[in-house]
Structure formats: C-alpha cells, structure tokens
Amino acid sequence: LSIVLLLPPSTAYGQLESVAKNLLDGMSKMLESGKVRFSIFMDGPTLEAASKAARPLMFGRFRKAIEEGFLEILGGGYHDPMLPLFPSELQAMQLEEHRKLLWKLFGIEPNGYFNSSMVWEMEMTELLEKNRFDYALVQESALQDALGRTTPIAGWYSVEDKGSFLRVVPVSENLSRAIANDDFQWQEIAKHYCRDGRSAVVALDVPPQPGDIVPFFERLVDFVETNDLATKTVSCAVNEQLPEGQLSFLLSAGRRIGLPSTAKTCRELLIRRPEVNLLHKSLMTLYRRARSNLKDKQLLEFYKKLLP
C-alpha cells in the first residue's frame, strides 16, 4: 500500500501556524513508529509555516527519513493552483518556487507531482517533464475513462505529448474512501489492486482542525500495525513496477472544485461560475499588460505577485 497524505491549499486554514506545528508532530510520530512509509504534499505557505514551527533537529530527522525511504515529499505548485487555467510562465514559476523551498528545507528535488484538485490535461506533460518530474498522481477514474474500463487500475502508465514523456499513477478513489471511512470491506477492495507485485495508491485527507491532526496520524499508525500492512512511498512503488501501458490522451476535471461528476475539464468552471470567469479574465489581462510593458526583474517581480 502506498499512502499519500493530502492537505488542502493553505488558504483553507485560519490557523496555519497551529496546523503546521501539529502536522510536524504527527509526521514525527508516524516516522518514530518505524512501521509506515508515506508520501505527503504541502503547499508553499504550509512549508514555510512548518519551517518556523519546527523544533531543533526536526528537519534533520525528516531528511534522514527521506534518505531511508520512509518519507517522500511531493512537489507541486507553490499555491497549489489548477495549472491548466494559467499561462505556462506562471505555471512554471509555481513549480519552481515550490521546488526551491523543498531544496532549502529538505535538500531534495521532488520526483512526484501532486495537485489537490487532481486536475489533468495533456499539456501538463511537457510542463512537468521540463520541471524534472518523473511522475504525476491522477484519479483512477480518469484512467478508466481513457482506457474504456470500469475495473480497478493499479501500477503506472506513460503519457506522451509533443515528444514529452511522463508517468501517471492512479489514486484509487474507492479504496481511499473505504479506508478513510473505516469500511470493513477495504481489504476486499484492496485485493483487486495489490496483485502481481503492484501497490495500491490511496490518498487520505489530513484533518483541517489542528487538534485532530496528531490523533489522525496515531490512528493511521495503528491501522497499519493492526493489519500488518507493507507500505511504500509512491516513488518507491513506481520504480519497482513495470509500466502497464501507454496513453495518448488523458483528461480529468478533478475533484472538489464545484463541478458536477459529468464535467470533463476544469475549464468548465469558467462557464458555470461567472465569478471565477471574471477573476480569471482579470488575471489574464494583468498578465498580458505586464508582459507587454515590463522587462527583466520588474516583470519577474510582478509575476510573483500575480501567482494564483
């Protein structure tokens, strides 16, 4: 089992410093157990809050856990935006700002890309490859649509677009939901994924309330120990498995962004939500004006202020 821990964008938290402190304590408890290997994504502001809240030597222990394969820090956008909605320059800046922070705090360059909305468009293949990502996490349902299947999908697939190559790794929505809800049938669901050396990938949401975070990690350790589960980081699982196939097209409208299940692309937000469309148009207008009138350092500084 590969466990991915997710936090919503930092703008969702009213007490980010308290969230960061409890998150670090929870991660430390899980690593101290020696039983759980896991991957986690934190956006830029959360990482910065964590660096201020960390106790002495804490990040040193995290670095050691990364080296030993117990912890993987996933990469993504600094503010965790839906990248396809923004110009490629701003997309690349989001990824680079987050990458710089991971290097500063952990001394690593991330292998895996994650976005909390799980949005995907083929144009992201080139962008992520240029930013040195090896794989991206996507919804299993998106792969099922692309393959014309309804059966469970595990392992990883390759996507190719305009000569760029990337691995995509499905996150099992059904298994994630079953484990999160303490559904006793989770083992039966897992059997369909964990066959022939494959590792199922599940995504679990870290609670938004600071006081619930450490108990969440404690329950997760207990769950792994009670069921005697073998866990791997996603990066480790991907490197140990052979490809399941190749995709020429993959599209996902993602999750939790206010679109119906029938939506095919996140761009439908611009049609269904006038306020989102207005904000998007305003941002694009500012971007084009800046590109026409500013140069070099001034342009870069403006882009940073414009990052969604």
State where each predicted segment sits.
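Short, well-structured secondary-structure segments
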Residues: L1-P87, N111-N115, D134-Q139, T233
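Phosphate/oxyanion-binding active-site loops and adjacent basic polyanion-contact surfaces
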Residues: V19-A20, F86-L95, V171, A178-D183, ...
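Generic structural signal for well-ordered alpha-helices
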Residues: L24-S28, F59-R63, L95-L102, T125, ...
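Active-site and substrate-binding clefts of carbohydrate-active enzymes
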Residues: L1-K21, S33, I153-S158, K162-L166, ...
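Surface-exposed loop and adjacent secondary-structure segments within mature catalytic domains
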Residues: E121-P170
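CE4/NodB-like, metal-dependent polysaccharide N-deacetylase domain
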Residues: S88-S117, I189-A203
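Alpha-helical scaffolding within the catalytic cores
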Residues: N22-G26, K52-E68, L147-V159, D183-H192
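A short acidic (Asp/Glu
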Residues: G14-L16, A49-A54, L85-P87, S117, ...
